[in-house]
Each structure stands twice: as C-alpha cells, then as structure tokens.
C-alpha cells in the first residue's frame, strides 16, 4: 500500500517528558490513546512508573503503555528492557479491564534478571559520592549487557540452553561483583534459567518482531501513539550526565526503539509539570528545600511510583524547558499538575540564569557550573482551587481562570510553543484540551 506522508497530522504522535521524568506522561497518554488504534512504548523498563486514575480505580504501569486501558493494541518495542515476571503480572491486571487488548512484545527486547537487580545495587555502592539514586530495578546493568553484546533477549527465553549459556557469560562478565553472591553457584543460575524459561513459555504468545508489525499497521492506515519513559533531562547524551538514566529518552528514540521512522511521525507532544520534580541525585537549579517544598510535595503526591521515595521539587525552569523543547523538536505542550500550584498565593518561574554574576542564555553541562547557576525569577499570582473551573474536556483559552491563563501565556511566550492540554488532579476526567 502506498502511503501519503502529508496526510492527517494526528495520525502518528510521540509523547515525551520535558523534565526529569514523572511529568504525567501516563495520564496524557491515557487521555490521548482513545483516539489511537495502537500505543507503543520504546524505552526503559520497570524504572518507569506511569499512573492512570479512572474513577475510583488507580492503575500503575511500569512496562505496559499507559494507553492499555483504552486502545486496541499495545506494543513493547525493542528499545525496552523487560522484567518478565512484572510483565506477566501487568498483563493479567490490564486484561481484567480491557479483555480485547492485544499485547505485543518485541522478540528483540532485552531481559532484566535477578542478576541485573543485584548488580544495580552493588554498582551504586561503588559510585560512592557520585551515587545516582537508581531505582534498583536492574535497568542499567541490563543495558550494559545489551551494549556489551552479552545480553539476554526475549526470544532467548524460548530456548533453555541459550538461557544457561548467556547467564554464564553474564556471570563471567561481572564476576568481580558476583563472585560473593548466590549467583556464583551454578545450581542457582540453573534454577534462574528454569524460571526464565517458564516465563518465556508464558509470554511467547505475545512475542513478535515488532518493527515489522508497527510498519505494517501504519501501512494499513492505523493511528499510532508512541509513549516515552523518563524525560529529556535524564537522557544519557543530553541530560546532566552521570545523573541520567540508561536509555535514550528523547523523541528520536522512538525510531531506534521501535524501527519506525521519525519521518513518519506527525507530531511531538512534550509533557511538563507546572513546576519541576526529580527523583535521585544530580543538579536541580530551582530546587526548594523549605516548608514550601513539603507543601508542594504533599499537595502533588510527589512520591515515586516505582520506589515510593519523596521527590525533590522546585519552581518551573524555563531555560531547561526551552532546551528540552529544542532537543525533542516539540510541536505542543501538555502542562500537568496545574491544580497543585493553585494552593499557593505566589508562584515563581525561573526565566533565566546567572553564572558567576553574568546572565547566560545556555544550559551549562559541566556539573560544577550547573551547581553555581543562580535562577532569575518572575512572580505570578496563584489561581486558587480549580475544581469548579476546569469542568469540560475542551475549553476556549479565555474560559480558563485569568491567573492561570497569564501563567500559560508566559510559558508560551518564553518557549515559543502552544500549551494545548492542561491537567489538574489525578483522574482522567481532569484533563482539558485548549481550543483556539
């Protein structure tokens, strides 16, 4: 079938995070997924935590795309690293609510094992003063093995002999850290291999070459939404290295993580909180460390979906947001947690930095420089409770409360991109598309 690449701008889209992750991508993907036939996730693993609230029910996704409750087909791309036990549990839960959902898992995606989780903890100990704050889900070590060409893939789980051979290779590659662990015992590795083989038998009905499938569905005219994990500021190439994640998180990663060309993507939707939050160590120019931080954290429920750890919070950082929009080539912005800031009388936004007494128009990359930047702030009046203001799924901009509208106008002027979606509260229904 011949495809006209100039057709419908909503046919394919990518949802990405514009901050340090936890921006609310799950809720936005769920909101958008009703309009898409297929939702594809392309990076990360169980280190991601996407929460969707529907009525009285709360769903927490770590592997399955957040669109799993509303769409017809979900795909886990080859750029992901998959904990098979967690995946089986998630599929069981989501099938109870969307029994007709088709789940497809890339045969080429790499597998997280108990060995990788052990290594994650041990490697974090070695980092000492440069501790990252890993989720200890085994994500980093799994990607290490992937790029060392010694990793275990989903398709390998169908052959017991291959599993044993690869586990032995992984052990020898990391013997300096594993020699004092239970995994030094060959019988323990054999039992792990049996466990992984049993997972493979259970998951084989979901496995396929997803690059072929996604392109086939596209050529058949299906609408496809790509969902990223984490955020651009955690990207190993464009974030504050080494305080980053182990997979690429930018919009272009949808190409390398699925085999679907970026030339066919019609829209990039960047998700940002109305403030900033972060889990783990690393630079955070606008971070708050006083009672106000606790007030925002508690109001916004800023505790990690995967770890339960309290998140660091701070004011919205326009320089970082501009940078993220540029890297991701964002077309429009979804702004989340606007209700959380509404509780404050005065709200600040960082519009620029000073470094060593001079105003700068770039993002320093050296950690020592970032630690010295001084945020310059613009102040805004709070907009109060939004529960009686944002009542419809679509609203004209002039219908939005004036103080919130001024905040949005400032962001749009600074970033040069429209805010097309605003989200308040946890529930799916508390999401508004701004019509112009």
Swiss-Prot record:
Enzyme class: ligase
A GO term from the CC aspect: cytoplasm
PROSITE patterns: ADENYLOSUCCIN_SYN_1, ADENYLOSUCCIN_SYN_2
Source domain of life: Archaea
Pathway participation: Purine metabolism; AMP biosynthesis via de novo pathway; AMP from IMP: step 1/2
Single Gene Ontology MF annotation: GTP binding
Co-factor binding comment: Binds 1 Mg(2+) ion per subunit.
UniProt xrefs under NCBIfam families: PRK01117.1, purA
UniProt family annotation: Belongs to the adenylosuccinate synthetase family.
Name listed for the protein in its UniProt record: Adenylosuccinate synthetase
Gene: purA
